């Protein structure tokens, strides 16, 4: 399994300033990042990139098939989301195994994306900024917090059992905002 803490093999761009945005489900990450993008700043969406990589990368396809089995993709090569979700949700170890395949690919894509940007500041929206250790890829990070109860109203379009399961997971995590050197901001 790849050591998620070690991104030293990747070439970090000298510019632009990279700011990570994270927060719990329904905290407003997407809303804030949409407003940032409206102001002309580039925003990299980690979840979207991870989904794209899982669907299109032959490397990831081969690794997930070897890990989970041939049913994770159908005969046409299309991801079978229920199979992947069942595997990930069955244990923390399984989730970590999938993360060890996908997260390094997302990190590499983010750094290449940064190199192509001309803006002095770029943003990364990442629900799992600290858990994925992507906070090591940004200069500053910010955690969006919203009053308890409000976030559920923002996520009401999702399946309720899924929301409850996700909230139980995220409620067990601790967050803070920090600069890359670990000082709280």
Which sequence ranges carry the predicted segments?
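Well-ordered beta-strand positions
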Residues: 42, 48, 140, 183-185
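ATP-dependent NMP and nucleoside kinases share a basic, alpha-helical "lid"
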Residues: 108-116, 122-157
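P-loop/Walker A phosphate-binding loop and immediately adjacent motor/lid segment at beta-alpha junctions
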Residues: 96, 104, 108-115, 154-185
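Glycine-rich phosphate-binding loop of ATP-dependent small-molecule kinases
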Residues: 1-78
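Short gly/ser/thr-rich secondary-structure transition/capping motifs
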Residues: 2-4, 104-107, 121-127, 167-171
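Short loop/helix-cap segments at secondary-structure boundaries that form the rim of catalytic
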Residues: 36, 131-137, 176-182
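Residue-level signal for inorganic ion chemistry
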Residues: 47, 98, 123
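ATP-dependent small-molecule kinase phosphotransfer cores
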Residues: 51-119
